Every structure is written in C-alpha cells, then in structure tokens.
Amino acid sequence: MDHKEVVLLLLLFLKSGLGDSLDDYVNTQGAFLFSLSRKQVAARSVEECAAKCEAETNFICRAFQYHSKDQQCVVMAENSKTSPIARMRDVVLFEKRIYLSECKTGNGKNYRGTTSKTKSGVICQKWSVSSPHIPKYSPEKFPLAGLEENYCRNPDNDEKGPWCYTTDPETRFDYCDIPECEDECMHCSGEHYEGKISKTMSGIECQSWGSQSPHAHGYLPSKFPNKNLKMNYCRNPDGEPRPWCFTTDPNKRWEFCDIPRCTTPPPTSGPTYQCLKGRGENYRGTVSVTASGHTCQRWSAQSPHKHNRTPENFPCKNLEENYCRNPDGETAPWCYTTDSEVRWDYCKIPSCGSSTTSTEYLDAPVPPEQTPVAQDCYRGNGESYRGTSSTTITGRKCQSWVSMTPHRHEKTPGNFPNAGLTMNYCRNPDADKSPWCYTTDPRVRWEYCNLKKCSETEQQVTNFPAIAQVPSVEDLSEDCMFGNGKRYRGKRATTVAGVPCQEWAAQEPHRHSIFTPETNPRAGLEKNYCRNPDGDDNGPWCYTTNPQKLFDYCDVPQCVTSSFDCGKPKVEPKKCPARVVGGCVSIPHSWPWQISLRHRYGGHFCGGTLISPEWVLTAKHCLEKSSSPSSYKVILGAHEEYHLGEGVQEIDVSKLFKEPSEADIALLKLSSPAIITDKVIPACLPTPNYVVADRTACYITGWGETKGTYGAGLLKEARLPVIENKVCNRYEYLGGKVSPNELCAGHLAGGIDSCQGDSGGPLVCFEKDKYILQGVTSWGLGCALPNKPGVYVRVSRFVTWIEEIMRRN
C-alpha cells in the first residue's frame, strides 16, 4: 500500500462539486482499478487529468485515477464493470457515468451500456464481424459510435432506440429493450430519479437539500449518500409515492414534484421472496393478517382507512389484494387493517432462515453495533484487534464484511477466516498500519477507523471540574498531537514502519513539488520531521527514504489533557434495542450524564442531563409545582432509584431558568460543581441548529414508569430511531402537532418509548466518538403506543440560549 488518502485540498475540491468538467464522472476515494489498457501522464489537477482522459486516442478512456501526492494521472480503458477494484491510499477513481449506466436517455444515441440481447432474446452479433450479416455500421466507419463487442447501440440515431445486428441469419437486426434513465422521467415511485427538476407541482422553487433554511430537516446529504440529494433537485428519500422537495416558501414546508413516468418498463428489482429477508421489501407472499391478528385492508380500498399507499402510487411494489407488503422502506411488511380503530400494523412473516446482517438491510444509517467510547484501543498495527468499533476516522459508518453494497470486495470472512471479520467491525485483515473498514458511503471506498493505539499506562480520571483545553503555543512542540496533528511541531522523523523520513527540502529519493518549505512556509516543514501539511485525517506523515515507498504515516500519539471529555462514558453502554417500558436495564454508570431530579424531601419525579459540572438541562414542565430553586435537588452518579450507592452525589439547585418561549426546556444551576468521576460525566451539547438525520439511532434513559415489568427502580435504556418531522406529522402519527423546535423518535409499532418519570431526561445520539445531547424528553400520546412516537425538545435550537445563561451566571 504505497499511497495515501487524498489530501485536504482535493477533498475540499471534491466536496465543492469539482466543476462542470467532472459532472460526467462518478468518483470514489481510496479505490484503485486494475486496468490492462492504461497510460500514466503528469497532471497538476483533477480537471487536467479529466481533460487527458477525454483527449486519449489510443483507446476509449472510461476512467482515470488521480494520485494527489505525486500529481500522477492514470487514464484507463476499463472501469469497475469490467475490472476488479482494490483499496489504496492517496487515490481517487473517476469513472465516466455514460459507461456505468445501463439505461438510455432519449433515443439512446449515447447509450454505452453492455446489454447484448434483442427484445426477443436473440444474442447480438459483434459489430466488427461480417457473419451472419455484413454490417453497414462498423467500428472502422463509425469510431465515435461506441460500436464495441456486441453491445446494443444506436449509430444511426434511430428514433426507436438502440439496436444490433443479430446472430440469427433470418433476422438482420432488431431493437434492444433498454430502460429509460430516470433523469427526464421516473420509474416506479421515483426512488432512483436523478433528474434536475427543482420546482414543485404548484411552481414553488425547491430548497437545497444541504440547506436548513427556511425549513430545518433531517434529510442531510452527508447522512444519505445513496439518495443522491444534490442541489435542490426533487428526490424521494423516504418512500413517498413520488419525488418531492422542501420548498423555499416559509409557509409551505414541502410538496410533491410533477415528474412524468417513463414509458419503458422499469429495471428489474432483483429476486422476490415468499418469506422475510431483510426488511421484506421484496416479500411477495400471501400473508394478509397482522401480528396482532387484524385482517388487512385491500391496498386499493379507502375504507375504513384513507391512504396514499395505493397500487397506482406504488406500481412496482406489488400491492395486490390485501397481502402484507413494505412499499415505503418500513422495518418490516405491514398493512392497513379492517379495524377502524387500528390504522395499520406490522405483519408476522416467517423468516427465510439465513437472514443477512449486511448494512444494506439495517433500518437506519447508524448500525446498532456502534463504536465503543470507553477503553477501546489497538496494539501494534491492530491485526489482533477484536473490538466492536465500526466508525471511521471521519465519522463514516462501516460496511459489513459480508456485504457487497455499496463496495464489492474480497475481504470476506471466507477469504480471511482468521481475521475476525465480524459484522461491520473495524479490522486489519491485510496487515495495514491500523484497523480499517469499507464505508457505507459509495463515494469513499474505505477509511482507517477512529481508534487510538493502546498506551502503556491507563489515563487517570480527573476528580475536579475542568474546561476543555485548547493547545497553546507550548503544546505545539510536545511529542504528541491534538486532533489530526496539523499543528504538530515535534521531532519524530521515522514512519510507523521505522523507516527514516526524507527531508522536506530534498528531492531524493522522491521528487515532489507540492509539500516543500517554499510552497508551505507555515506548515513547519523543517528537516525530516513528521508533519501534516495537508490536514490529513490520518495524522502526520512524511516522504520516506525508501525508494519503493513514496510516503507513510508516523506514529505520533494523541496528547493527554487534564480535562474531561464530554459524552464519553468510562463504562461502555449496553446499547440495548429493547424497550424502556418493558425493561432493558443499563450497565451501571454507562450513561454518566443522567441525573435524577427530586423534590427537596421527596423521591424521583423527572430526569435531566448534566451538561457541565454546574449545570443540568431538564424539561420546563418538570418545574411546574414550584419556581423556587430550593424546592429541588439533583442526584448524580446513581444506578438505582431508591438505594443510592457509593459515589453518588446529591447537590441542591441554586438557580433555575425556564426558556422564555413555549419550549419545554429549562436550566438548573447546581449549588456546587459536580465532581467529575467515572460515574459522573457531562454529555456534549450539539452544534447550534444542528438537525439529526432521519432514522439516526439514538438512546433514551430513565427511571420512569415500566408498567410493573422487570427492572423497575434501575436505570433503563432503549435505542430509538429519529423520525423526520415530515413523517412524524403525518395524519396517522402525530397529525401536525410537532413543531420545528421538537423532534420525534420511536418505533412506530409501539412497545419502546420513554414514559412518566422519564420527562426531562436525555435523548443522546452517537457522533463519531462521543454522545451528543440532541433531545430533552418532553411529551407523547401515552407510553409506547403504536403510531405515537415520543416527542423531544430539539436541544440544538436552544444552544445559544443555554450558553448565554451559563455565561451570565
């Protein structure tokens, strides 16, 4: 592995769109293509490399690779459809969309796919041969028509679309059955529509998916890389009947778009099943009774329940009779019921047996087995690491090792039986520098994992409150790094493999021009010291003195601060997906920010969250009985509600602040700072106005009502998916009652929810390497009822108010 992840400059360039010259390419970071027909050329930029691909005359250039460190460009005749891909550092693979596509636009004159059969199923004749038919159109006569192999083409601009000469002597030519691309029309419900329509049915301009104004939303392009949420184009990321968008009208949150249906049959959707596989989206069995015993309503009927999940709106979902189906990406097949009191329910479908655990079948972007935050590290190069981390250094989620989506690969448990390739956990099957994984982002093939190297001695726990440190000028000279080490100015000068570094000013054994003391005078490129001039996520590196290896990373440890890390428990949470109502007892002290709010001389009545040593966040409605701070006290570090054990802290409330608007949120100032211990650690506050992505897996905790089930009196936890407000406000759920200052979370089937006594408590979401407080438990229609998810105050909307109150007091 002689290359490295792409430099920050290139990453920023990629994120900005790369410009018009690269719009016709699909790019994948960290992917290396094995191509027999290739040419290596010099190029100062990605665009220059693309221009050389377009100008290539010795072969048809279908792809190119750009190596940023040595400004190397490789143009190639093959692409990922015809040649294998490996992972590599410091490379981005660009493939022409036209050669990856198996659909046609218009009459298909530019179709360059690999279909090689006619509509009637006859194999096509090669364009370069003269038997059984002498061709009028050949590669020699029409070199720009893409007449390769025996693939269907349209060299004469035939209005009926691509065709080919046939291998049947009795039939000279016939047309091919090529589906239309979803750029000017849509198949099915438009789940794969990729066009550029950006106005709603009533003519309102669409809001950009990357914008949170005028409407905040949870469909973030970075969290849904498979949904193609580009610009402000109409899309269908959530299983609606057709594409839609948020609008630029502050008074109209969202609206459907007017996309015409394609006239050709849709592409095949893969195998169908008579049993449950994954989420059951391809289930085509005849079960027509829900798990609770209700008979299903016919999909074509509007009684007793009116709905838009009709055969007309979902023509590809086989909504026949009253059979259980999953047309909209729910967690399992379901149906509307014939009981007017029960709108819908899930069905109990027998499993196919060997159900997959691949990431493509998870019901949320965040896998349930999340990266540990407590005491998870690797030794050596991490080949022996068998932890459960599944997050990369940039915060991306790992792809399951048994999955081939979105990245096909050969690092499978069968090929590497001793590498511990379990679930989507970070591993090092090929003796790389540290554990890594393939990512669930189609644009990034793989990344190193967000793991640290084990230290010789354990870090001590601070017993006094502190403020998170910012590295000072003195810190820069220490032989350790903060963050990605861009400001590291230590004197390490060997790579992780022990090879001495080449001096930055030298041109031997490796010539380079991008990272020199002259081009980067502020990057500290002195002598041959390890540095990170490009802000590489993987840390400091250097060119090596090994002529066979251009560069490698250095083994620079993270600096240890005396401050606590918010959102990082010392005890790893269970992260159990079971219910709070019904009981899933947490591991003691694994949610160390959870507090019990009590009356001065009474018991627990509400929850809350420690956000700094002196401050607790809770729900405003918890303080309705008294506005006097002296009426309340806070219990920290507890696991049992009634029997407070060793290490529990009991602190009075000195001040309370209720958010001045209608929001159900309040701040409590403690009479003395909490002592930060293994059992008492604050949660992190979110970025102001941050919106949690739809279906993000988050966690609620509390000592609330459990309806007499197991675990009463012990701190419980549950994993809940966030539900986008657009969905939560549907008539069948909460009917427009949820405001932009609130968020929904829960399982629509019911059974898992916060309840009485959990009010004011935390809803925390895992982000990269810590838990962030995104919600304050506020209200709900009953406890754990079907179709009635819990509602939480959206903390990010009040961060500015929170910080201002804390600063003034």
Curated annotation (Swiss-Prot):
Catalytic activity, reaction form: Preferential cleavage: Lys-|-Xaa > Arg-|-Xaa, higher selectivity than trypsin. Converts fibrin into soluble products
EC number(s) reported in the record: 3.4.21.7
Domain Peptidase S1: start-end pairs: 580-807
Domain-related comment: Kringle domains mediate interaction with CSPG4.
Gene Ontology CC: extracellular space
Post-translational modification: N-linked glycan contains N-acetyllactosamine, sialic acid and is core fucosylated. O-linked glycans consist of Gal-GalNAc disaccharide which is modified with up to 2 sialic acid residues (microheterogeneity). In the presence of the inhibitor, the activation involves only cleavage after Arg-579, yielding two chains held together by two disulfide bonds. In the absence of the inhibitor, the activation involves additionally the removal of the activation peptide.
Positions of disulphide bridges: 49-73, 53-61, 103-181, 124-164, 152-176, 185-262, 188-316, 206-245, 234-257, 275-352, 296-335, 324-347, 377-454, 398-437, 426-449, 480-559, 501-542, 530-554, 566-684, 576-584, 606-622, 698-765, 728-744, 755-783
More details: Plasmin is inactivated by alpha-2-antiplasmin immediately after dissociation from the clot.
Signal peptide feature range: 1-19
Official protein name in the record: Plasminogen
InterPro entries linked: Kringle, Kringle-like, Kringle_CS, Kringle_sf, Pan_app, Pept_S1A_plasmin, Peptidase_S1_PA, Peptidase_S1_PA_chymotrypsin
Example GO BP: tissue remodeling
Keywords, comma-separated and alphabetical: Blood coagulation, Cleavage on pair of basic residues, Disulfide bond, Fibrinolysis, Glycoprotein, Hemostasis, Hydrolase, Kringle, Phosphoprotein, Protease, Repeat, Secreted, Serine protease, Signal, Tissue remodeling, Zymogen
Function in brief: Plasmin dissolves the fibrin of blood clots and acts as a proteolytic factor in a variety of other processes including embryonic development, tissue remodeling, tumor invasion, and inflammation. In ovulation, weakens the walls of the Graafian follicle. It activates the urokinase-type plasminogen activator, collagenases and several complement zymogens, such as C1, C4 and C5. Cleavage of fibronectin and laminin leads to cell detachment and apoptosis. Also cleaves fibrin, thrombospondin and von Willebrand factor. Its role in tissue remodeling and tumor invasion may be modulated by CSPG4.
